[in-house]
Amino acid sequence: MKITAVIVAGGKGTRMGADKNKVFLKIFGREVLYYTISAFEKNDKIDDIIVVTGKNDIEECQILVDKYDIKKVSYITEGGATRQESVMNGLKKAEGDVVLIHDGARALVTDDEINNSVADCIKFGAAAVGVKCKDTLKSADSDGFIAGTVDREKTFMIQTPQVFYLDKILDMHKKALD
């Protein structure tokens, strides 16, 4: 079974006030994207990696891949106008059976998260990393006023990777874009 990681790294860093894509900011001397790609590079379940980034960042991505001698990156491809279009561009380059879609800025992904989400996808058809919500959640009425408290025991915050059978997620994206 071939497993591909699609790393979406097309952000501009605007919300955090950065003057460039946040995945190229350095932590402990290395780019955030280095740590993200490395997690998938080192994982023995991952066969190849596709990086999706902005047109102006493709060269910087290639420099990073070369600089750190990353072997599993098979494509660096241009993103789209939206995250969904960027994901679709990455999926179009993917081959094989299972695909993990992961945010390039989420550098702290663990082997267990990767391995468990792949295993759960194979078992259940799809999977995503999620963490129980610890904050107090409120629901609002149509006027925006608090209507009640949501039971946080039944809520999860979904993160990445999100894992799917490639043919299924491609079909869903095609339908969503039609």
Q: Model-predicted segments: where are they?
A:
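N-terminal glycine-rich phosphate-binding loop and ensuing alpha1 helix
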Residues: 1-58
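Conserved N-terminal catalytic core of the sugar/cofactor nucleotidyltransferase
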Residues: 34-96
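Short aromatic/hydrophobic "clamp" motif used to bind/position activated sugar donors
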Residues: 99-100
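Conserved core of the sugar-phosphate nucleotidyltransferase
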Residues: 108-178
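Hydrophobic packing residues within well-ordered alpha-helices of enzyme cores
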Residues: 16, 61-65, 117
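Short, conserved active-site loop motifs that form the nucleotide-linked donor/cofactor pocket
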Residues: 3, 73-75, 155
